[in-house]
């Protein structure tokens, strides 16, 4: 895992920040070590309870990708396409 800050909104509650941080961690795991598709999609559903607008999701996703190199959008698309099993992007 690289050293960078997760994009967060300081107006969020602590609980909301934890939910969004869990999303960024799940994207990292999917790209580095892999994780179950259902766990990723559940984490995304929780993320959408905090980040409701697609515009905000895209903005945060871009900030995260610029910092980490991992794309929320591409990871989510792969999870939806795959549907089940272990989600693993990137090089083995």
UniProtKB/Swiss-Prot annotation:
SUPFAM superfamilies: BH2638-like. It comes from the Bacteria. InterPro entries: BH2638-like_sf (IPR023324), UPF0223 (IPR007920). Belongs to the UPF0223 family. NCBIfam families: PRK04387.1. This is UPF0223 protein EF_2462. It comes from Enterococcus faecalis (strain ATCC 700802 / V583). The lineage of its organism: Bacteria, Bacillati, Bacillota, Bacilli, Lactobacillales.
